[in-house]
């Protein structure tokens, strides 16, 4: 409702085929705020947060030159939207999550040093230390993930899956940080007023969870499902051969997957880096899960677990990347990477147990 220039996506139809494109489909056009017929006065109220949002109404006559890219780009709006989302969701919401987590970490750090209970500072209490540990752990991961993803975007890439990982992981981890910070700040955090530095971030956390793709949808369908669709070298050729009833092609692709799995298994024995070994094990596990084909869309708990493993691997790499380029604490870096890998091993065991894959018991620990 506050925008002066609006990008409008709509389903373009051309019954008389004036554009010689048949039925063009999703198209994106730019319209100005004061365009005749545009009603732009509806304000939603997302949790009383400063998040301007509202619906657009009206019966508009949009010139064809307002289509982004002109007449030639009629019907290519879906590609535009996906490319924009691939970059955009990796910037705005992760940055917001990063900021709120840093404010909470900084504020709570000083609070537990100064606040005393039972004649001792809060920082000396193990229960507080446990919660603050989670705050630092997740804040560091968010900062590292945002930093590496920004560098990827600055290089001109549009990583759809990586941006989905960073959006989902950063907003979820920021909510964890804020929950722990609220617990430590206790009564001060639930009373509105100028001294409450957490309330506005806590209130806004569900917005980041929801917008630009619900985290539930992103985790269960997008991260692993779309990542598999974009990256696996053999499995979809295998599924196509089944649909085409092509026995020769099926045998060829199945042999490639089998050879790839054996190669990864043998390669894992020669790796001394634990993170690299877990990456190889995940790639091998993916070969087995991918054989489910379209059933992955229905088995969303399995897809979600695989997404968590994939996300943790990316975040572990980002923590090492951040340490390398910023000369940060090696002790903290090793702790976070080890903890992410431990979480992953539990998830890998869970996937193997639920699928009943006895043939890859060597990965089970």
What feature does the model see in each segment?
Residues 189-270, 356-365:
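Glycine-rich phosphate/cofactor-binding loops in nucleotide/flavin-utilizing enzymes
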Residues 114-130, 324-329:
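Terminal amphipathic helices with adjacent charged low-complexity linkers/tails
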Residues 254-365:
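C-terminal amphipathic alpha-helical interaction region
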Residues 109-110, 127-154, 172, 179-182, ...:
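Loop-to-helix element that buttresses phosphate recognition and phosphoryl-transfer chemistry
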Residues 36-61:
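Flexible, small-/acidic-enriched active-site or ligand-binding loops
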Residues 157-189, 331-344:
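Charged, glycine-rich active-site and insertion segments that engage polyanionic ligands
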Residues 1-38:
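A short core secondary-structure module
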Residues 55-89, 106-123, 265-270, 280-297:
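A glycine-rich, basic-preceded beta-loop-alpha segment at the flavin cofactor/substrate interface
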